[in-house]
């Protein structure tokens, strides 16, 4: 009880974060401009008569949004462009985008202060070096060998815009900021409908990248909070493995917050989800929920998730978005790999005194295969080959210099090898390498108006071979396992490169 009371006092102190006045500070929009130019992902900022950022113009835009005629227009003409006023340049799309970036920076401040004020004794230093994408593959290789069923979840979105604002009310106790967020979101969608149009989501994400990520992470954080809370409360075993991959979610404090908000939550219903061994991994709008329980238990979790999204987030999700498969008999698409846990036969000769006999055993092995058909399809879409994998020239690159052509082909080839370096079978990679090599040769031959044979005889194939096998200096981790018995062909070396987050679009089919 004292623990909950202490947390309640901390929760009340969060109400002192009043971030609305920061929207009228010049340096906030300077940060937004610098983020757009120097961010990890380039943000396209629309120019507007070469006008500079100004908090005064943003203030005029906010006042315009709160005027009564603006409200009347938004109700009577929901599809009208309500922020654009071509007679006044400060109502253009440029300043609405700047307001979006500035608002995203401002609302992130309470979360940053909360993270900095976290007590040192509650930190878990051993998890700091695991918050990277390359740690997921060794995790799957070590844990999934002991599991039976896997649920492949497509995290649903669309979600009502009002729900997004209500989710932030638990974290941001600033009414003017929340009202401003409502007005701004009303620009993209009518309040009486869902964001069901993929076109609306695409434009909102493109024009307001930082705000979109903030809202999406808040929604996913809320969903994972309830999911993992029920999972942890339903088992006596610690759930350290799942917490490894949930960055900046503050799991322990959320559990306390849940106890205060919902004190009457009955533990009697938790037996329904009892599962002593379960692992959860989320990536790019999808999630994997693996378990050692029965198929009936997985169906219970599926029903729970569907009802949870329906009654808590107030929207219906299709049951087909959650696929339940048995690991031993199926494969799943994960981060550009086709992963599976097949049972490999192993023949062991055992000799006891004068008698010798053979023991036929089956061992599980986490297998990662390069999706050849999918990657060839993307190469075909990028006009490197035909749909059947036959290499063709790249006409759009013939205006470049020879070195630029070689550099582009070589970069794509190296990225493919770096990203799929942990594959258990490299034959598909060599096939892709052959397609890119011959496509490069055809492109150069087309530029110089000669045949591939004549071009290769003049330059020699050794130059292309040396270029494509050149390795960049990248940091990598090598995960090896020590076994008591070494069998021929039973040990394969896996290398997972650390630069696979920033990669060419071709090697990431999810983009």
UniProtKB/Swiss-Prot annotation:
It is found in: Plastid, Chloroplast. InterPro entries: Domain_X (IPR024937), Maturase_MatK (IPR002866), Maturase_MatK_N (IPR024942). Keywords: Chloroplast, mRNA processing, Plastid, RNA-binding, tRNA processing. Its main location: plastid. GO terms for biological process: mRNA processing; RNA splicing; tRNA processing. One of its GO terms (molecular function) is RNA binding. GO terms for cellular component: chloroplast. Pfam families: Intron_maturas2, MatK_N. Belongs to the intron maturase 2 family. MatK subfamily. Usually encoded in the trnK tRNA gene intron. Probably assists in splicing its own and other chloroplast group II introns. PANTHER family: MATURASE K (PTHR34811:SF1). This is Maturase K. It comes from Hordeum murinum subsp. leporinum. The lineage of its organism: Eukaryota, Viridiplantae, Streptophyta, Embryophyta, Tracheophyta. The gene is matK.
């Amino acid at each position: 009880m004292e623990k909950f009371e202490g947390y309640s006092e901390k929760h009340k102190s969060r109400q002192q974060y009043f971030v609305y006045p920061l929207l009228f500070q010049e340096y906030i929009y300077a940060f937004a401009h610098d983020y757009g130019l120097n961010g990890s992902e380039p943000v396209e900022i629309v120019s507007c008569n070469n006008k500079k950022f100004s908090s005064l113009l943003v203030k005029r835009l906010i006042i315009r949004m709160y005027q009564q005629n603006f409200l009347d227009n938004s109700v009577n003409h929901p599809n009208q462009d309500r922020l654009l006023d071509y007679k006044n340049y400060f109502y253009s799309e440029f300043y609405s985008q700047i307001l979006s970036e500035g608002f995203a920076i401002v609302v992130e401040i309470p979360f940053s202060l909360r993270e900095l004020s976290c007590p040192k004794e509650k930190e878990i230093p051993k998890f700091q070096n695991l918050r990277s994408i390359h740690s997921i593959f060794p995790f799957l290789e070590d844990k999934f060998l002991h599991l039976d069923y896997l649920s492949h979840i497509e995290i649903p979105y669309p979600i009502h815009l009002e729900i997004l604002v209500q989710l932030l009310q638990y974290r941001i106790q600033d009414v003017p900021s929340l009202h401003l967020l409502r007005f701004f979101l009303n620009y993209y969608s009518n309040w009486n409908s869902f964001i069901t149009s993929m076109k609306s989501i695409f434009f909102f994400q493109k024009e307001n990248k930082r705000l979109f990520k903030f809202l999406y992470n808040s929604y996913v954080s809320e969903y994972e909070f309830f999911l993992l809370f029920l999972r942890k409360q339903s088992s006596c075993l610690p759930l350290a493995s799942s917490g490894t991959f949930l960055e900046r979610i503050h799991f322990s404090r959320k559990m306390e917050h849940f106890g205060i908000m919902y004190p009457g939550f009955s533990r009697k219903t938790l037996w329904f989800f009892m599962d002593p061994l379960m692992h959860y991994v989320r990536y790019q709008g999808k999630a994997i929920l693996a378990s050692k329980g029965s198929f009936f238990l997985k169906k219970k979790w599926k029903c729970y998730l569907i009802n949870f999204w329906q009654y808590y987030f107030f929207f219906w999700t299709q049951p087909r978005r959650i696929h339940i498969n048995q690991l031993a008999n199926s494969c799943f698409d994960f981060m550009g790999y086709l992963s599976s846990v097949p049972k490999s036969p192993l023949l062991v000769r055992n000799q006891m005194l004068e008698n010798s006999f053979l023991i036929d055993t089956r061992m599980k092995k986490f297998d990662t295969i390069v999706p050849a058909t999918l990657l060839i399809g993307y190469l075909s879409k990028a006009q490197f080959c035909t749909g059947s994998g036959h290499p063709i020239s790249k006409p759009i690159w013939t205006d470049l210099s020879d070195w630029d052509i070689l550099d582009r082909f070589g970069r794509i080839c190296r990225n493919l090898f770096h990203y799929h370096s942990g594959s258990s079978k490299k034959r598909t990679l060599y096939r892709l390498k052959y397609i890119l090599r011959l496509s490069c040769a055809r492109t150069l031959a087309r530029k110089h108006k000669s045949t591939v044979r004549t071009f290769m005889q003049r330059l020699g194939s050794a130059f292309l071979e040396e270029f494509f096998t050149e390795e960049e200096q990248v940091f990598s981790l090598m995960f090896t396992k020590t076994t008591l018995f070494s069998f021929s062909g039973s040990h394969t070396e896996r290398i997972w490169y650390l630069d696979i987050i920033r990669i060419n679009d071709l090697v990431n089919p999810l983009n």
